[in-house]
């Protein structure tokens, strides 16, 4: 199991954490919170029963810009488990030009191995730092030969208590950062990886070729002259890589991928067969993608470069706006594999007010922080926030409803002049009120033709 505290979070705690970043959509948050908690519950069961409990996959339905993708993004951070987000439109039926759906699981395995490798390196960090420190000191103060039979590798790892007085002094200076700008010459491992461009659908071949060239050049090193400040992170990374066991990492990562993996499939509605007459041209390929996804969701074995991954217990969360298609337009077998349906509601003016002010990294806080870097103290009055929310809701209603993304457009337009002039206004304070908002945006909002192209 992943070595994380978030694995034991209750559904209520998960929802509270999501509330810090996402406004509203309580039903969707509850659904993903319960699904996450069920992963933990399943792992507490006896092994015989554990294998019979399948994840309840989720289908999120709602217009664009209401928080579907943001929920997935925050969930990935929160779960600290193998997670991959893909767009259904990037995949095509087997035999067509495009990505094979099995690439989803290969990407998940890559993510899992990377996650576990980073965790393993964190565990050996202190030891790696000590080894890196010794290598830097060896470059600064080469050890004296101990005569016949002297083993330089054994000498390198002598206890620090046996260091001579000069070495102890240099070690203290090194830890205090007093030697950071001094240049040293070191043997540094060479990364023999090679970038290989492959056509769509042949990513696996590209990975295998990269691995082959990497193995051919493995173990090589070269002498480089670096400052101690630049050399230290390179040496720590290299020493940590020597200390971790790659076989153990791969075994644990594959198990985590199978037991805790989460796949988020966005824009699932774009591969649904649409009901209109005359739209059958692309339906064959769309239905083919669904049929290729079906074995992954039902449970199958996928070969990856780390080993075979069983997808039986991977949690799949799909989302789509379903403007032109309906969930019932998906093939029946795939519909049945997403038993939990959650509808996300369109955002209102009141939601926009909350989005602008409540989240931990709310848009207004972001702009205030950005302009503060130029020495401009920007503040938004409550009337300005209310007016901005009203304008965003109006434009969404009059034109295409793009949800909270409209706020980005409105705020960029509002602060266009101030952002341009900020370097010349160092030390000034600017308060944005409703009058300022109307002065900057009023004409655009009132003119439908202008707002269509600018807002």
From Swiss-Prot:
Subunit composition and interactions: A double ring-shaped homohexamer of HslV is capped on each side by a ring-shaped HslU homohexamer. The assembly of the HslU/HslV complex is dependent on binding of ATP.
Gene Ontology molecular function, alphabetical: ATP binding; ATP hydrolysis activity; peptidase activity; proteasome-activating activity
Record family assignment: Belongs to the ClpX chaperone family. HslU subfamily.
GO cellular component, one term: HslUV protease complex
Principal location: cytoplasm
The entry's keywords: ATP-binding, Chaperone, Cytoplasm, Nucleotide-binding
Lineage: Bacteria, Pseudomonadati, Pseudomonadota, Gammaproteobacteria, Lysobacterales
Annotated protein name in UniProt: ATP-dependent protease ATPase subunit HslU
Organism domain of life: Bacteria
Pfam families from the UniProt entry: AAA, AAA_2
InterPro entries listed in its UniProt record: AAA+_ATPase (IPR003593), ATP-dep_Clp_protease_ClpX (IPR050052), ATPase_AAA_core (IPR003959), Clp_ATPase_C (IPR019489), HslU (IPR004491), P-loop_NTPase (IPR027417)
Entry keyword Protein transport: no
GO BP of this protein: protein unfolding; proteolysis involved in protein catabolic process
Location relative to the cell: Cytoplasm
Species of provenance: Xanthomonas campestris pv. campestris (strain ATCC 33913 / DSM 3586 / NCPPB 528 / LMG 568 / P 25)
Binding site for ATP: 23, 65-70, 266, 333, 405
Function: ATPase subunit of a proteasome-like degradation complex; this subunit has chaperone activity. The binding of ATP and its subsequent hydrolysis by HslU are essential for unfolding of protein substrates subsequently hydrolyzed by HslV. HslU recognizes the N-terminal part of its protein substrates and unfolds these before they are guided to HslV for hydrolysis.
């Amino acid at each position: 199991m992943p070595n994380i505290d978030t694995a034991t979070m209750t559904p209520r705690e998960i929802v509270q954490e999501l509330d810090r970043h996402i406004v509203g959509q309580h039903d969707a948050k509850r659904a993903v919170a319960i699904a996450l908690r069920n992963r933990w519950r399943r792992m507490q069961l006896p092994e015989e029963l554990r294998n019979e409990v399948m994840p309840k996959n989720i289908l999120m339905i709602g217009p664009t810009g209401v928080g579907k993708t943001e929920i997935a993004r925050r969930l990935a951070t929160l779960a600290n488990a193998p997670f991959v987000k893909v767009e259904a439109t990037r995949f095509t039926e087997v035999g067509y030009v495009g990505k094979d759906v099995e690439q989803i699981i290969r990407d998940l395995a890559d993510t899992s191995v990377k996650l576990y490798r980073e965790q393993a390196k964190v565990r050996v960090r202190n030891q790696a730092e000590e080894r890196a420190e010794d290598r830097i000191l060896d470059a600064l103060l080469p050890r004296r030969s101990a005569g016949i039979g002297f083993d330089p590798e054994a000498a390198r790892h002598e206890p620090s208590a046996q260091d001579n007085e000069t070495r102890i002094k240099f070690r203290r200076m090194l830890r205090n950062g007093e030697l950071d700008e001094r240049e040293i010459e070191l043997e540094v491992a060479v990364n023999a990886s090679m970038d290989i461009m492959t056509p769509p659908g042949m990513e696996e071949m590209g990975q295998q070729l990269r691995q082959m060239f990497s193995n051919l050049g493995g173990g090589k090193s070269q002498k480089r002259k670096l400052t101690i400040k630049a050399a230290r992170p390179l040496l720590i990374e290299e020493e940590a890589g020597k200390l971790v066991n790659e076989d153990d990492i791969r075994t644990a990562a594959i198990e985590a991928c199978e037991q805790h993996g989460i796949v988020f499939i966005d824009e699932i509605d774009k591969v649904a067969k649409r009901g209109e007459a005359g739209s059958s041209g692309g339906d064959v390929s769309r239905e083919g993608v669904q049929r290729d996804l079906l074995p992954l969701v039902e449970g199958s074995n996928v070969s990856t470069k780390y080993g075979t991954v069983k997808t039986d217990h991977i949690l799949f969360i799909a989302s789509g706006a379903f403007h032109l298609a309906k969930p019932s337009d998906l093939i029946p077998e795939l519909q049945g594999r997403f038993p939990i349906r959650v509808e996300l509601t369109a955002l209102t003016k009141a939601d926009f007010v909350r989005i602008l002010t409540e989240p931990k990294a709310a848009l207004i806080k972001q702009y205030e922080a950005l302009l503060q870097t130029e020495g401009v103290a920007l503040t938004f009055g409550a009337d300005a926030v209310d007016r901005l929310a009203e304008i965003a809701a109006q434009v969404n209603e009059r034109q295409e409803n793009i949800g909270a993304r409209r706020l980005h457009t409105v705020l960029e337009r509002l602060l266009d002049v101030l952002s341009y002039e900020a370097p010349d206004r160092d030390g000034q304070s600017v308060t944005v009120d409703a009058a300022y908002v109307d002065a900057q945006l009023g004409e655009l909002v009132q003119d439908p033709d202008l707002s269509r192209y600018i807002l």
